[in-house]
Amino acid sequence: MTRAPSGPGVRAALALAMASALILLGARPSRAEYTLQQSTQPGAHYHSPQDFAVQVTFGPYRPDVDSEFSMPRHPYLDYFGDGKNLLTQAQFDYQVFHKMGTVAIGLGAGFFRVSGSSPVASNPAQPSGDRSTLTVVPVSLSGVYRFDYYLERDGFPIVPHAKLGLDWAYWQITDGNGEIARAAGGRARGGTLGWHAAIGVALVLDFLDPTAARDFDVEMGVNHTALVFEFGHYDISGLGRSNRMHLGDDTWTMGLMFEF
């Protein structure tokens, strides 16, 4: 068997090769460091994977309870007045398609509560000392389309969107003691099915501070932060079923959205 060459020259060459390899491996950046270096180079654009969106919005809401009653009956007006109160909503989107815009499936939930004085039975226009509270918790499943093609290509910050979906809203009425009220031999709570359609627009805030937006993406994976405005028609009246509490409204909401 031929013996491998050895000697001072060979050993020196091997030592030099090993030292060079160690230096190169030690100097090589990790994937995250490489990404950060690339993203901070002049003119570079970093974009982490984008699969989800979360938005939180607020807006005025007045459930259309009185639409199911014939005149002159208007129990919501008698109990809670004709004003609108705050509706808080949150939605989580799973983005399934990115080409000429973004298509997503969204799951949302909201919360609304209003309190008022019960009217005197003999004179509905006169409030009594008894308090009643209506609580509504709407849940929605939506198909969402956002036209963000020019945002991704050119950084244009205005992104319109459209939404269509189904709703189910839980409702309950409690008395002044916080207990579920009773009416017509039953308990004053239930659920109503419905549907909604909405259009809106988002102002993506990345342009205000591109460096901070890029760092937010690199470090936290948040691709975009945006102000969102939306106007929607909510028909939550039972999808044709009778004897359901009507909880729909035409209203607007505004809030923040994060894509990641």
Annotate each PLM feature:
Residues 58-64, 109-115, 147, 166-174, ...:
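Transmembrane beta-strands of outer-membrane beta-barrel pores
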Residues 32-95, 238-246, 257:
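Short glycine/proline- and aromatic-enriched beta-strand/turn motifs that initiate or cap beta-hairpins
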Residues 1-48:
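Cleavable N-terminal export/targeting peptides
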Residues 89-176:
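Gram-negative (and chloroplast) outer-membrane scaffold detector with strong preference
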Residues 63-84, 112-139, 170-193, 240-246:
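Extracellular/periplasm-exposed beta-strand and loop segments of Gram-negative cell-envelope proteins
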Residues 42, 56-58, 88-96, 107, ...:
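Residues on the lipid-exposed face of transmembrane beta-strands in outer-membrane beta-barrel proteins
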Residues 200-260:
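Predominantly the C-terminal beta-signal and adjacent terminal strand-loop region
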Residues 43-50, 95-103, 148-158, 206-225:
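Short loop/turn motifs that connect adjacent beta-strands in outer-membrane beta-barrel proteins
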